[in-house]
Curated annotation (Swiss-Prot):
Family: Belongs to the ATPase alpha/beta chains family.
Protein name per the record: ATP synthase subunit alpha
GO CC, alphabetical: plasma membrane; proton-transporting ATP synthase complex
A GO MF term: ATP binding
NCBIfam families: atpA, PRK13343.1
Lineage: Bacteria, Pseudomonadati, Chlorobiota, Chlorobiia, Chlorobiales
Summary of subunit composition and partner proteins: F-type ATPases have 2 components, CF(1) - the catalytic core - and CF(0) - the membrane proton channel. CF(1) has five subunits: alpha(3), beta(3), gamma(1), delta(1), epsilon(1). CF(0) has four main subunits: a(1), b(1), b'(1) and c(9-12).
Organism, scientific name: Chlorobium phaeobacteroides (strain DSM 266 / SMG 266 / 2430)
Length: 526
């Protein structure tokens, strides 16, 4: 039986199929790898790539366009260079380098691309923000006026830090720079400050130690650790601080307070120098590229105290669309960059650059560290340019003459080594100075509440400790603060709540100290 083909049926079937045919095609802008090695790839064909745009290489290796030249694009690789070879196809993503942000990041250890590396599973966040962003303009800022307590007596009394400030921690290796930063993070517990610790070029074991310390003191609850270790590619070390700043800006722009520690920026500068030389950019002083100052200035300028006026804050320059509905005023981002010097040379290229960008510096010295003064802060050349207006009144009152007293003590101490015949006044000044130096010493990971600092510094500057043997000052401090806490809690409470040291509060501290010193000295003789 022969079947007859009806032309109208055939044409209707063809019409149906043609109507359902989707002619859409995915269009990718692709290029070819010309050369690869040392974390750098030269790509031909990506004529529309933007500076800072993410590029997709084979084997899930991501890269970023950094050099836009006439005939090729110089890209840095965020993965292993040996996974990419000449002739490989590279895709443009159309996305500028960004990082996921949100509360889910707290308590986690991530790499600079926002990927978790702590084995605690994926991080669920809704928002991505660009790594590079212009700093808020002058109109959107407010002057620094709220204190950020570090818990370290030497810093909170003489080199105070305010929320929104950039304070440099500078010193040779092994002088306690990281310890100062970690103590500050631990001291933010219960103060509503979110912390970001950015480890750049450190050993993996050192980062693990920092994370363990933060966990031990319950600080990981409000902290994110971003790490690009010494074994990670240079491009990751280069972008790590920008990832920290972006995460901090999320908290700052949503009306909260954040603290970011960059440990350390000398290693970021070295990584950037490596990339720049491999990209054939012309070298300048110490072989650093000409824009190494801009590298650090554009990063540190992002730390700011934002205006309380929400309407003004919402008009902030370069505000990402993802944040516009969440903006609140009054937030702050405080930066503590760390710089490592060689043999105490603060006048080298990178240290002078960062000193000129920041609002002050805390200078740590090997000699002081080795002589047992810890934190090993050289008060003479350490300074906080804007923190004074953020210091609480009580501390300003008791520590007003502290810096001068210590400077005079150091001078007299140097002279007293030459001669043994000292008059009474000089001897008294030397004794007072030795006790002040002693009360500023502090153990690691034992930050002290500001009201306790005020009480003990008050005794030192008022000369009440002159009767206590200098070798027993630390013991006295511990026992006296314990006494205040249990027998006179209202004294500490008054300082903490009002931020001032009223005359009757000062008298109560004096009375308690005089009684306690008598019994303390008797105990010592017994």
């Amino acid at each position: 039986m022969s079947t007859t083909v009806r032309p109208d049926e055939v044409s209707s079937i063809l019409r149906k199929q043609l109507a359902g045919f989707e002619s859409e095609a995915d269009v990718y802008d692709v290029g070819t790898v010309l050369q690869v090695g040392d974390g750098i790839a030269r790509v031909y064909g990506l004529s529309k790539a933007a500076a800072g745009e993410l590029l997709e290489f084979p084997n899930k290796v991501m890269g970023m366009a950094l050099n836009l030249e006439e005939d090729n694009v110089g890209a840095v690789l965020f993965g292993e260079s040996n996974l990419v070879k000449e002739g490989d196809t590279v895709k443009r993503t159309g996305i500028l380098a960004s990082i996921p942000v949100g509360e889910a990041m707290l308590g986690r250890v991530i790499n600079p691309l926002g990927e978790p590396i702590d084995g605690k599973g994926p991080i669920e966040t809704q928002i991505r923000l660009p790594l590079e962003r212009r700093a808020p303009g002058v109109i959107y800022r407010k002057s620094v006026h709220e204190p950020l307590q570090t818990g370290l007596k030497a810093i909170d009394s003489m080199i105070p830090i305010g929320r929104g400030q950039r304070e440099l921690i500078i010193g040779d290796r092994q002088t306690g720079k990281t310890a100062v930063a970690i103590d500050t993070i631990i001291n933010q517990k219960g103060k509503g400050v979110f912390c970001i610790y950015v480890a750049i070029g450190l050993k993996g074991s050192t980062v693990a130690q920092v994370v363990n310390t933060l966990e031990k003191f319950g600080a990981m609850e409000y902290t994110t650790v971003i790490t690009a270790t010494a074994s990670d590619p240079a491009p990751l070390q280069f972008i790590a601080p920008f990832a920290g700043a972006t995460l901090g800006e999320y908290f700052r722009d949503t009306g909260r307070h954040a603290l970011v520690v960059y440990d350390d920026l000398s290693k970021q500068a070295v990584a950037y120098r490596q990339l720049s030389l491999l990209l054939r950019r012309p070298p300048g002083r110490e072989a650093y590229p000409g824009d190494v100052f801009y590298l650090h200035s554009r990063l540190l300028e992002r730390a700011a105290k934002i205006t309380d006026d929400i309407e003004v804050a919402r008009k902030m320059n370069d505000l990402p669309d993802a944040l516009k509905s969440m903006v609140k005023g009054g937030g702050s981002l405080t930066a503590l960059p760390v710089i490592e010097t060689q043999a105490g040379d603060v006048s080298a290229y990178i240290p002078t650059n960062v000193i000129s960008i920041t609002d002050g510096q805390i200078f740590l010295e090997s000699n002081l560290f080795n002589s047992g003064q810890r934190p090993a802060i050289n008060v003479g050349i350490s300074v906080s340019r804007v923190g004074g207006s953020a210091q609480i009144k009580a501390m300003k009152k008791v520590a007003g003459t502290l810096r001068l007293d210590l400077a005079q003590f150091r001078e007299l101490e140097a002279f007293s080594k030459f001669g043994s015949d000292l008059d009474k006044t000089t001897k008294a000044q030397l004794d007072r100075g030795a006790r002040l130096v002693e009360i500023l010493k502090q153990g690691q990971y034992i930050p002290m509440a500001v009201e306790k600092q005020v009480a003990i510094i008050f005794l030192g500057t008022q000369g009440l400790l002159d009767a206590v043997d200098v070798t027993r000052i630390r013991k006295f401090e511990e026992e006296f603060l314990g006494l205040l806490e249990h027998k006179h809690p209202e004294v500490l409470k008054a300082i903490a709540e009002t931020g001032t040291l009223e005359t009757d509060t000062a008298n109560k501290i004096k009375e308690a100290a005089q009684k306690f010193i008598a019994s303390f000295n008797q105990k010592a003789k017994a």
